[in-house]
UniProtKB/Swiss-Prot annotation:
Gene: PTGIS
Origin organism lineage: Eukaryota, Metazoa, Chordata, Craniata, Vertebrata
Purpose of the protein: Catalyzes the biosynthesis and metabolism of eicosanoids. Catalyzes the isomerization of prostaglandin H2 to prostacyclin (= prostaglandin I2), a potent mediator of vasodilation and inhibitor of platelet aggregation. Additionally, displays dehydratase activity, toward hydroperoxyeicosatetraenoates (HPETEs), especially toward (15S)-hydroperoxy-(5Z,8Z,11Z,13E)-eicosatetraenoate (15(S)-HPETE).
Keywords: Endoplasmic reticulum, Fatty acid biosynthesis, Fatty acid metabolism, Heme, Iron, Isomerase, Lipid biosynthesis, Lipid metabolism, Lyase, Membrane, Metal-binding, Prostaglandin biosynthesis, Prostaglandin metabolism, Transmembrane, Transmembrane helix
Name of the molecule in the record: Prostacyclin synthase
Native organism: Homo sapiens (Human)
Membrane topology, record value: Single-pass membrane protein
Swiss-Prot/TrEMBL cofactor(s): heme
GO biological process, one term: cellular response to interleukin-1
SUPFAM superfamilies noted in UniProt: Cytochrome P450
Length: 500
């Protein structure tokens, strides 16, 4: 009894200490909301459904506010007119490295000496643009053709059933892996292509197990069983992507060669290089499959949109100088001449891309808002932008923002629509699936080309149908807010076959 009383007294004293040290709002700071639970604050609400929670907070406090989340003070900014003041701020004031390094170490067990994301991006940029982008695009088309049509041919004639997310994710990740990390042999033979399909399928299925547990891993909420499984999956991926294994592969990308040289120059061990390569597999391939899933699902659920995209692709084929059966790549000028498909992709990403854009506040600073207001931010706090809520789902910017409209990003003359407004002012940032500012996605062009090539191959070479035409669009897996493209709560069954 005495011990119980003592523990109760200690708990009460601890609670009083926490309450006495609770932060108060200073003049010039954003509205402060600490929640009702000391230290935790709104961690449970935020983790359960970030979009719904932040919507409620915006209704309560406006487009900027500070909340307590698991001992951290997070200032949330939801005014897209003011985003540029954040994303282009120098690292000496708002740092985007610290959080990236934290996730790199926590999720992927990667520790790199003297690591600088900015230096790495500057180096990688050269391998993802211009002539190198053309080489990646051509290799991606070849590999998509090999895995998509190779698997379908191997499975035999007739219909084949699988989930649409599995369908999109597996083919895009497998082709992307072969494009960046290399193929079995050159010149390619039927045997080597079969080996590529088997090996890339092994990589995908192992990676997918990691991907499913990633939100729990990032939040430190894995069960004991999950932790054991995660250790096993990571070990398997490290073996599959070890530098020694990759050294035997042919036609490796300039991106891979440059990245491995970068790691070697930093003195990184081969074991740590393998871990870094798993991280890069997720960073380069983890969003394309889910993006293609939503795009294809919206097309399958919207006959008018599907007909418009098919019509555009048929027009491209009609203008081509060779039959589609002999097409070995889609030239960049063709990929850049698909305004309808571009609009469909932009609309699909608007509805489903939900990354967090974060900055660590390095020094006390005054942040200007676009409307003339100014708010003081404290050193040590975190600043969070969530474009999914605004601009992407903002009813002031988009009519019926929850509804898929395939031509939302098209002008009446068929050109790309870029004029969107909020509060009577034209928006610079009206759709932000690729991030912005200093951490804008370098691989955007490669990803867009890959998704468009995949859609082209699917619609031209395959019949693809929903098994249940009346199936509802699935809800989001709410645990994935902040990680890029949302994934569905459950997969959607489809069937496909090679066109006769």
């Amino acid at each position: 009894m005495a011990w119980a009383a003592l523990l109760g007294l200690l708990a009460a004293l601890l609670l009083l200490l926490l309450l006495s040290r609770r932060r108060t709002r200073r003049p010039g700071e954003p509205p402060l909301d600490l929640g009702s639970i000391p230290w935790l604050g709104y961690a449970l609400d935020f983790g359960k459904d970030a979009a719904s929670f932040l919507t409620r907070m915006k209704e309560k406090h406006g487009d900027i506010f500070t909340i307590l989340v698991g001992g951290r003070y997070v200032t949330v900014l939801l005014d897209p007119h003011s985003y540029d003041a954040v994303v282009w701020e120098p690292r000496t004031r708002l740092d985007f490295h610290a959080y990236a390094i934290f996730l790199m170490e926590r999720i992927f067990d990667v520790q790199l000496p003297h690591y600088s994301p900015s230096d790495e991006k500057a180096r990688m940029k050269l391998t993802l643009l211009h002539r190198e982008l053309q080489a990646l695009t051509e290799a991606m088309y070849t590999n998509l053709h090999a895995v998509l049509l190779g698997d379908a041919t191997e499975a035999g004639s007739g219909w084949h059933e699988m989930g649409l997310l599995d369908f999109s994710y597996s083919f895009l990740l497998r082709a992307g892996y072969l494009t960046l990390y290399g193929i079995e042999a050159l010149p390619r033979t039927h045997e080597s292509q079969a080996q590529d399909r088997v090996h890339s399928a092994d990589v995908f299925h192992t990676f997918r197990q990691l991907d499913r547990l990633l939100p729990k891993l990032a939040r430190g909420s894995l069960s004991v069983g999950d932790k054991d499984h995660m250790c096993s999956v990571k070990s398997r991926l490290w073996k599959l992507l070890s530098p020694a294994r990759l050294a035997r592969r042919a036609h490796r990308s300039k991106w891979l060669e440059s990245y491995l040289l970068h790691l070697e120059e930093m003195g990184v061990s081969e074991e740590m290089q393998a871990r870094a390569l798993v991280l890069q597999l997720w960073a380069t391939q983890g969003n394309m499959g889910p993006a293609a899933f939503w795009l294809l699902l919206f097309l399958l659920k919207n006959p008018e949109a599907l007909a418009a995209v098919r019509g555009e692709l048929e027009s491209i084929l009609w203008q081509a100088e060779q039959p589609v059966s002999q097409t070995t790549t889609l030239p960049q000028k063709v990929l850049d001449s698909t305004p309808v498909l571009d609009s469909v992709l932009s609309e699909s990403l608007r509805l489903t891309a939900a990354p967090f854009i974060t900055r660590e506040v390095v020094v006390d600073l005054a942040m200007p808002m676009a409307d003339g207001r100014e708010f003081n931010l404290r050193r040590g706090d975190r600043l969070l932008l969530f474009p999914f809520l605004s601009p992407q789902r903002d009813p002031e910017i988009y009519t019926d923002p929850e509804v898929f409209k395939y031509n939302r990003f098209l002008n009446p003359d068929g050109s790309e629509k870029k004029d969107f407004y909020k509060d009577g002012k034209r928006l610079k940032n009206y759709n932000m699936p690729w991030g912005a500012g200093h951490n804008h996605c370098l691989g955007r062009s490669y990803a867009v080309n890959s998704i468009k090539q995949f859609v082209f191959l699917v619609l031209v070479h395959l019949d693809l149908e929903l098994i249940n035409a009346d199936v509802e669009i699935p809800e989001f897996d709410l645990s994935r807010y902040g990680f890029g493209l949302m994934q569905p709560e459950h997969d959607v069954p489809v069937r496909y076959r090679i066109r006769p």
